[in-house]
From Swiss-Prot:
GO terms for cellular component: plasma membrane. Belongs to the dicarboxylate/amino acid:cation symporter (DAACS) (TC 2.A.23) family. InterPro entries: Na-dicarboxylate_symporter, Na:dicarbo_symporter_sf, Ser_Thr_transp_SstT. HAMAP family: Ser_Thr_transp_SstT. This is Serine/threonine transporter SstT. Its main location: membrane. It holds the Pfam family SDF. The chain crosses the membrane at residues 24-44, 48-68, 82-102, 142-162, 194-214, 218-238, 292-312, 319-339, 365-385. It catalyses: L-serine(in) + Na(+)(in) = L-serine(out) + Na(+)(out); L-threonine(in) + Na(+)(in) = L-threonine(out) + Na(+)(out). One of its GO terms (biological process) is serine transport. It comes from Neisseria gonorrhoeae (strain ATCC 700825 / FA 1090). It is a multi-pass membrane protein.
Amino acid sequence: MAFGKSLFHAIGRVSLVRQIAAGLALGIVIGSVSPQLGLAAGLFGSLFVGALKAVAPVLVFILVAATIAQHQKGNKAHIRPIIVLYLIGTFSAALTAVIAGMVFPTHIVLAGAGDVSAAPPSGIVEVLKSLLMNLVANPINAIANANYIGILAWALVLGAALRNHGSDVTRQVVADLAEAVSTVVKWIIRFAPLGIFGLVSSTIAETGFGALAGYAKLLAVLLGCMAFIALAVNPAIVWWKIRRNPYPLVFTCLRESGVYAFFTRSSAANIPVNMALAKKLGLHEDTYSISIPLGATVNMGGAAITITVLAMAAAHTQGIQVDFATALLLSLVATVSACGASGVAGGSLLLIPLACSLFGISNDVAMQVVAVGFIIGVIQDSAETALNSSTDVLFTAAADLGRQRNRAE
């Protein structure tokens, strides 16, 4: 018993990032050496992601409602500058992907269209309609289905009603509930090393490394664009807001948010992680409690890259010459489409046919490109989610720190 306690204390003294690195390394070894054991260990990953996905909608709803209910008149949440950064970042990602697609034209071997079962949206109007319908969804269904647009809408409305008509006791109860749910999130995050061990070992056991070799160039363009956005474009945007070296903040967000998101492959599951990081950075709670759930829905730079690169690859594969005007239009369409990716089953991949339609590519060919996307998804989806989710907290921090700098001047 004493040995067990001392072991737990010893583990507790090791930083969470180092524990995650150890879980990652062990997962690679187990998944490679014993695929059967790796698949069995996947249960830990499923439980971890399931717990995060379960608590995230409740956390967002209660935290946003509590923030609005406690909000004092005269205080501002300063959401608009963050939304502007989200849009600038997403458009920059799409434009970068267009340029990369023209400089490094990629041809792909198309997979069978039968590999894709879901139906893509028929146009941009359907994407926007999906977003608006999510806005007015039943609040219970919104929480149950992790519809964050609906959750935000109802939390804002309920919080405003409590602020104007609720008693002090009622508002305090909601605030206490928010604190309690945040504590539960901290407990879940402590299991991240075990969860990531399970996710990595099962992924390697299922796919290995050989399945991705045939699409090496496509993956190189995709990951290169995402790395360029994360390490060059985003830091430039952050510098514009805070006017000092952005890289300490950038690397903090990548390390403490991006790593989680890479392995969970879910922006929704990463919301509690981003909330905890925003609190650790000392950001304004009225701001991040709204901007981070919103970012998980509309800040989709990684999705814009995926849509654009695969659409450009489809055009090159079909022998279609893409002029600059069409490429610029593709950037705009990818930006708007990416912002609606969370409202579409299948996410960014199922919006590729919409982008392909700009080039007159048939839906049959476009769906084969989507099938290729699913093949490389083990890497593409992880990197895309890491970029999307880490950028949520990065831009929130940049806007908040920039506002503090302006106020100090």
